[in-house]
């Protein structure tokens, strides 16, 4: 039991419903000052809704929500929420603003109509210096659009500090970061919690990272707290998985990889650049490893997203280079983006139109037929997608369920090649295993898979061979299944295992 007077925020018996769907069913949760607190739970458990209630973007239906200041005094909910900030997986920054403008923006929203560049620069430098003095000295006049994702996170955290935040909620902050960037982020969080008394809620599905950074953890399952404020070191990975209700799903991960069976086509694909090529047989899963520069260039060429002259894709009936993603899709080359929020999910269209998007692109149809509606319902059931209606918007679904929708697009059209960009990014362990099995099943139909992941353990588990890129973005070799290892991948990519 924690001392309530030391909690920066605490909720008791919190409830929240959306229509007939009860999302939070009596959640208890508290965060102490200076603490890094891991919030765990499967997709759809209620984590995002809890965050929305704490930050005030959703109103609670029942229960108690208490904020305290640094002295332990109880604040009104309105005052308390001014001390809370969220850094989402998809950053909320305007690319055309400078770093200084982005950090100082909340101050000018509060009343001043005149932008004072000198004041903005001073405020931004003071906040950013708390994180990284060297970065603060060089970044203020840079455009946000020119920053790396890690640098953008630093700007968001600095903006929160500049606004007086005492609690920062980080939602899957490492999903798009390299190992080195992740370690730098962890260093920043440790510095701020120890030296400045900041409190952090860290939402992640990565067990290793949770153990590296979090002091305590709480687990939500089906809208209820099943583990509250337990020291992370006291819980094994298996115990965490069981509390999340995903022990059975994890066991599936150790099943043998089914042998590929080519039934769609017996034509192989050859992916080539000057002096190098790799042949991808139907039903084969080719992993792609390395820093983003190489994989991103390859993927752009595979799906016709750029006039990339470096790579060619050879297959009977296909051009050497697709002119556009639409042409690629029409000829049977699908793509699932790693940026589901901005480039994947069609937020203004219902679930059924999201699932049928690839069919629309390849066949030109506009409206769902009754037969397509039935097929879509069957597909949702097979994928274990829980949705009240096919006509609901996808924003009502968890991140993992949205990821299933993106994959479902290519289950209802014949595909000879499917290119996957970080397909399990930001999903829980159970959903990850379901995606593994889904891709294995697609491979057995003869679909060739190209799978880019920054998680080497994932590539080792799922792939038949791995194409590696070095830190300069150059292809450095192909590793066959029987030679795959963490050390081999680290050697060819130049990145630590």
UniProtKB/Swiss-Prot annotation:
The keyword Cell membrane applies. Gene3D superfamilies: P-loop containing nucleotide triphosphate hydrolases. Keywords: ATP-binding, Cell membrane, Membrane, Nucleotide-binding, Plasmid, Repeat, Sugar transport, Transport. It is a peripheral membrane protein. ATP binds at residues 41-48. It is found in: Cell membrane. Its main location: membrane. Pfam families: ABC_tran. CDD domains: ABC_Carb_Monos_I (cd03216), ABC_Carb_Monos_II (cd03215). SMART domains: AAA. Residues 9-247, 256-496 form the ABC transporter domain. One of its GO terms (cellular component) is plasma membrane. One of its GO terms (molecular function) is ATP hydrolysis activity. Belongs to the ABC transporter superfamily. Ribose importer (TC 3.A.1.2.1) family. Probably part of the binding-protein-dependent transport system y4mIJK. This system probably transports a sugar. Probably responsible for energy coupling to the transport system. This is Uncharacterized ABC transporter ATP-binding protein y4mK. It comes from Sinorhizobium fredii (strain NBRC 101917 / NGR234).
């Amino acid at each position: 039991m924690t001392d309530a007077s030391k909690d920066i925020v605490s909720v008791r018996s919190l409830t929240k419903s959306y229509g007939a769907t009860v999302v939070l069913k009596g959640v208890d949760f508290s965060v102490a000052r200076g603490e890094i607190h891991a919030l765990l739970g499967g997709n759809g458990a209620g984590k995002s809704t809890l965050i929305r209630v704490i930050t005030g973007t959703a109103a609670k239906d029942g229960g108690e929500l208490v904020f305290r200041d640094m002295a332990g005094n109880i604040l009104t909910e309105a005052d308390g929420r001014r001390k809370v900030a969220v850094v989402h997986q998809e950053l909320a920054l305007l690319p055309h603003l400078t770093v200084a403008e982005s950090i100082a923006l909340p101050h000018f929203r509060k009343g001043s109509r005149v932008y004072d560049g000198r004041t903005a620069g001073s405020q931004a430098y003071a906040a950013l210096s708390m994180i990284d003095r060297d970065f603060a000295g060089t970044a203020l006049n840079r455009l946000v659009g020119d920053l790396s994702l890690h640098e953008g996170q630093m700007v968001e955290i600095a903006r929160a500090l500049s606004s007086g935040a005492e609690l920062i909620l980080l939602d899957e902050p490492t999903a798009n970061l390299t190992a080195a960037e992740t370690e730098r982020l962890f260093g920043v969080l440790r510095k701020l919690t120890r030296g400045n008394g900041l409190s952090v809620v860290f939402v992640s599905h990565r067990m290793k990272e949770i153990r590296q950074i979090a002091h305590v953890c709480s687990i939500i399952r089906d809208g209820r707290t099943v583990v509250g404020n337990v020291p992370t070191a006291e819980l094994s990975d298996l115990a965490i998985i069981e509390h999340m209700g995903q022990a059975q799903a994890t066991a599936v991960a150790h099943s043998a990889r089914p042998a590929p069976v080519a039934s769609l086509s017996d034509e192989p694909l050859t992916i080539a650049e000057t002096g190098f090529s790799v042949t991808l047989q139907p039903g084969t899963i080719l992993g792609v490893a390395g820093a983003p520069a190489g994989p991103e260039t390859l993927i752009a060429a595979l799906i016709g997203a750029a006039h990339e002259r470096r790579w060619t894709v050879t297959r009977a009936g296909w051009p050497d280079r697709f002119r556009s993603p639409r042409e690629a899709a029409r000829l049977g080359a699908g793509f699932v983006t790693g940026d589901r929020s901005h480039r994947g999910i069609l937020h203004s269209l219902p679930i059924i139109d999201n699932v049928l998007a690839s069919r629309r692109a390849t066949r030109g149809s506009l409206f769902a037929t009754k037969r397509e509606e039935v097929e879509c319902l069957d597909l949702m059931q097979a994928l274990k997608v829980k949705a009240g209606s096919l006509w609901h918007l996808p924003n009502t679904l968890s991140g993992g369920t949205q990821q299933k929708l993106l994959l479902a697009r290519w289950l209802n059209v014949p595909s000879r090649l499917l290119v996957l960009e970080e397909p399990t990014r930001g999903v829980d362990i159970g959903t990850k295993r379901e995606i593994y099995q889904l891709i294995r099943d697609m491979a057995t139909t003869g679909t060739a898979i190209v799978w880019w992941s920054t998680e080497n353990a994932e590539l080792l588990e799922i792939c038949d061979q791995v194409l590696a890129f070095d830190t300069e973005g150059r292809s450095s070799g192909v590793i066959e299944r029987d030679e795959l290892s963490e050390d081999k991948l680290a050697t060819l990519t130049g990145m630590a295992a």
